[in-house]
Regions:
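Negatively charged
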Residues: 1-112
Length: 112
C-alpha cells in the first residue's frame, strides 16, 4: 500500500478500516523516512499475512502493536527486517501459535 514511499515521514491512519484485511504484507516496505506510526485503531482479526510489513522502516524508533490480533497469522517472514533504529517494539499480545514462517523476523534490528 505504501510500498517504497521513501519520503513518507508521517501518516494519519486513524480512519482506516482494516476489519476485512487478510494481508498487510509489504504495507510499509522501504518507508525509510517514516518516523512515527500509530496503528492502534487497526482491526486485525482476519489477518493472515504480515510478510515484510515494516521491512526497511529504518527511521522508526518505536512501534506499539499490542492491539494486533495475530491469532490467524501464518507468516511473519521479515516483518521487521532492517528496522535498524527500532528500540521499543510492543508485541506483547502476539499469538504465534499458527505462524509457520518467522524467518528473518528481526534480522538487522540492531537496536532492539
Amino acid at each position: 500500500m505504501f510500498f517504497i514511499c521513501s519520503s513518507l515521514k508521517e501518516i494519519n491512519l486513524s480512519s482506516f478500516n482494516t476489519e476485512n484485511v487478510i494481508s498487510m504484507s509489504l504495507m510499509f516496505f522501504a518507508c525509510k523516512s517514516l518516523k512515527e506510526l500509530n496503528l492502534s485503531n487497526f482491526k486485525t482479526d482476519k489477518l493472515t499475512g504480515m510478510e515484510e510489513m515494516f521491512y526497511g522502516c529504518s527511521s522508526l524508533k518505536e512501534l506499539n502493536l499490542s492491539n494486533f490480533n495475530t491469532n490467524n497469522v501464518t507468516s511473519m517472514h521479515s516483518a521487521f527486517y532492517e528496522c535498524t533504529n527500532l528500540k521499543n517494539l510492543n508485541i506483547s499480545n502476539f499469538n504465534t501459535e499458527n505462524v509457520t514462517d518467522m524467518s528473518d523476523l528481526f534480522l538487522k534490528c540492531n537496536s532492539l
